[in-house]
Amino acid sequence: MDPQAFVDAVREDNKTPLSRLGASKALYADTEGEMDDETVLAAAGDRAHHAAETLSAWADDESDEAAADLFADLAETERDHAETVASEHGDYEPGDPPAVQAHLRTVEGTVERLGALVGWALAAGNNADQVVGYFVGQASPMTASTFREVSGDYDDHVEETSEALATVCESDDDWERAREAAGATITADYEDYFETLEALGVNPKPVC
């Protein structure tokens, strides 16, 4: 398997969760129904802040030098994202870790962590796109433009991480472990979305 085939497989495996995590209800779940500028920014900040903490911890205990460098680089990008939120929302203070970060902190192994990161970045990019859409709707083009750049960073994360996988996956079994880790990460994000909306009395499934 090559990097693009891996990403395509993860997308196909998780088509429904990724689609729903890229819909407006996902942002509603992230903010627990509080759809105002400060709450949307705070939710985005929490995702970035806690992702940076997870990635920094991985960089510190990773034995593969190239993977450790990648984790450190991605952590720095996520810190930049959190600082972007702070510049837009002057009173921002980090809240509790999102469920997907709690899941990622249980993942062990270089192959598994890289696979999990692909899943995380695919879902995170969808989330950033929803933040863009929110601020477009709020007639805040500068903030929307800022989050378009954030979304683009997640596209880069997917590419860089899948390419890193190609250097550590030595067998089909390795690729399969990475694929399962990606799916489990998307599932963790999706289950939190589903449970949060149900608790808010909202149907998590699209109404046809």
Regions found by a protein language model. Name each.
Residues 2-208:
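Non-heme di-metal
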